[in-house]
Amino acid sequence: MSNKVNFKTASFLFSVCLALSAFNAHANKSDAAAKQIKKLEEDFDGRIGVFAIDTGSGNTFGYRSDERFPLCSSFKGFLAAAVLERVQQKKLDINQKVKYESRDLEYHSPITTKYKGSGMTLGDMASAALQYSDNGATNIIMERFLGGPEGMTKFMRSIGDNEFRLDRWELELNTAIPGDKRDTSTPKAVANSLNKLALGNVLNAKVKAIYQNWLKGNTTGDARIRASVPADWVVGDKTGSCGAYGTANDYAVIWPKNRAPLIVSIYTTRKSKDDKHSDKTIAEASRIAIQAID
């Protein structure tokens, strides 16, 4: 009996030691990554916000992850998900034809401009908003189907995101004024919401597959998170660029080879209105974050 007890005790203690060793290794990686991001931030001369999740191990890494950053166009990834969630509830028809006129289109509406005579399906408009950052598609969808910026915020609250807030339309939401809370979220909230929508149970399997394919087909992110991973890893992302205060961002679901998916959210902003954004900074922050959760 004594030998059995001793064996069980030894096994338990061994398991605890392994767990502590893994925890310490991850903590050391996180500390090293934070120092690297801090140096990157100093070189960038602005703020960098990061949150990353390994959905397999549960490891996370954050840097300024609870601070607010301007969303810019990155909210359009969640707009597309909001459309699909309503399609799932049979409140909207993804094949519904949407008609519009030139006066409905804002600057940078590359896809909706092509079809302003014939119109587009709701699904094609949603994918254009995500994959091409089409502002015409974005505003039309928000106005006619989602209840405007307030409706977008309500949708995000419905999935448990209490940080996201959308206050204005395209193009007004891109001011990115330091300290302005309008049209902002946090890197951690963005990553968690993406995890719920792209990999979780908010969307059923059929609709979720559509959403994942839309993310994978994004055309605007090649120089950002996509540039931080091996070529054979699959990435689905949504970028944002405000065009002011060097503000730009990207968030992604990453499917590595033979591993569970990763979630990465990178937000950047600078001090002066005329400062330029840096795709390389976003890519490097992503690379560091992925190493930290490995």
Curated annotation (Swiss-Prot):
Induction annotation: Up-regulated by the carbapenem, imipenem. Expression probably regulated by upstream promoter elements.
Into which EC class is this enzyme placed?
hydrolase
Q: Keyword Protein biosynthesis: yes or no?
A: no
Q: Where is the active site?
A: S73, E172
**EC number in record:** 3.5.2.6
Tell me which residues bind a beta-lactam. Answer: S73, K76, S133, N135, T239
Extract the GO molecular function terms from the UniProt entry.
Answer: beta-lactamase activity
A GO BP term here is: response to antibiotic
Which reactions appear under catalytic activity for this entry? a beta-lactam + H2O = a substituted beta-amino acid
**So what does this one do?**
Class A beta-lactamase which confers resistance to the beta-lactam antibiotics, including penicillins, some cephalosporins and carbapenems, to JM109 strain E.coli. Acts via hydrolysis of the beta-lactam ring. Has penicillin-, cephalosporin- and carbapenem-hydrolyzing activities.
| Miscellaneous | The class A beta-lactamase family has a specific amino-acid numbering system, sometimes called Ambler or ABL numbering and often misspelt as Amber. A multiple sequence alignment was used to derive a consensus sequence and then the consensus was numbered taking into account insertions and deletions. This allows use of identical numbers, e.g. for active site residues, despite differences in protein length. UniProt always uses natural numbering of residues, hence there appear to be differences in numbering between this entry and some papers.
Name the protein family: Belongs to the class-A beta-lactamase family.
Protein name per its UniProtKB record:
Beta-lactamase SME-1
Q: Which organism is it from?
A: Serratia marcescens
> Lineage of the source organism?
Bacteria, Pseudomonadati, Pseudomonadota, Gammaproteobacteria, Enterobacterales
